[in-house]
Amino acid sequence: MSKIYDWFEERLEIQAIADDISSKYVPPHVNIFYCLGGIVFVSFLIQVATGFAMTFYYRPTVAEAFTSVEYIMTDVNFGWLIRSIHRWSASMMVLMMILHVFRVYLTGGFKKPRELTWVTGVILGVLTVSFGVTGYSLPWDQIGYWAVKIVTGVPDAVPVVGESIVELLRGGVSVGQGTLTRFYSLHTFVLPLLTAVFMLMHFLMIRKQGISGPL
């Protein structure tokens, strides 16, 4: 094993990278509330893992969506557990994100020179809420259907372009298969990709600038 490690070490300088990560200075004022962002990240990873597992059985069609969710809950081995963990971690992600925003705001973590870190964090907050909105509709039950109908109908109040936005979100004039397909694509591909990109930016800026000082 040592020869293999030495081979990689010679080319990638693994030890130098590990030392840089492990030796990063942590200010003495940091407490447990500074871990809230990390909990959001862990919740996101759980979401990705459990969501990916469910894509093997979920069918994003109006006729089969609800039945496929029932199948996951009743017939798939540990399907009930995987979906439950997905739901619980989703709630945890939203809650921890809200608490994280409050912590950053109350400790002044949004001030110069960390404005861009704050902006990426706000974008991540919007993406987190979008996860909830799109995921809520995927079982395509009565609650999901009417939630989608209400949410996608909100932009109709926007002057001039409101009707076009509604049709874009719904994939047509009314809520149907086009809507479910759009929400499924957003929930499983677009939003995770955007979240991963902005999380990387967020972490790199925190790594560069360090944790903000006490008030």
UniProtKB/Swiss-Prot annotation:
Which terms does the UniProt entry file under GO BP?
Answer: photosynthesis; respiratory electron transport chain
* Localisation: Plastid, Chloroplast thylakoid membrane
This protein's cofactor list reads: heme b; heme c
Ligand binding (heme c): 35
A Pfam family of this chain = Cytochrome_B
**Which SUPFAM superfamilies did the record assign?**
Transmembrane di-heme cytochromes
Q: Does the keyword Ribosomal protein apply?
A: no
Name the Gene Ontology molecular function terms of this record: electron transporter, transferring electrons within cytochrome b6/f complex of photosystem II activity; metal ion binding; oxidoreductase activity
Q: Which amino acid positions bind heme b 2, per UniProt? A: 86, 187
Sites binding heme b 1 sit at 100, 202
Topology with respect to the bilayer: Multi-pass membrane protein
Domain of life of the native organism: Eukaryota
A GO cellular component entry from the record: chloroplast thylakoid membrane
The transmembrane segments are: 32-52, 90-110, 116-136, 186-206
Per UniProt, the cofactor note for this protein states:
Binds 2 heme b groups non-covalently with two histidine residues as axial ligands.
List UniProt keywords, sorted A-Z. Chloroplast, Electron transport, Heme, Iron, Membrane, Metal-binding, Photosynthesis, Plastid, Thylakoid, Transmembrane, Transmembrane helix, Transport
HAMAP family the UniProt entry points to: Cytb6_f_cytb6 (MF_00633)
General function of this protein: Component of the cytochrome b6-f complex, which mediates electron transfer between photosystem II (PSII) and photosystem I (PSI), cyclic electron flow around PSI, and state transitions.
Q: Give the family from UniProt.
A: Belongs to the cytochrome b family. PetB subfamily.
Q: What else is known?
A: Heme 1 (or BH or b566) is high-potential and absorbs at about 566 nm, and heme 2 (or BL or b562) is low-potential and absorbs at about 562 nm.
Indicate the quaternary assembly: The 4 large subunits of the cytochrome b6-f complex are cytochrome b6, subunit IV (17 kDa polypeptide, PetD), cytochrome f and the Rieske protein, while the 4 small subunits are PetG, PetL, PetM and PetN. The complex functions as a dimer.
Name by which UniProt lists this protein: Cytochrome b6
- Species of the source: Porphyra purpurea (Red seaweed)
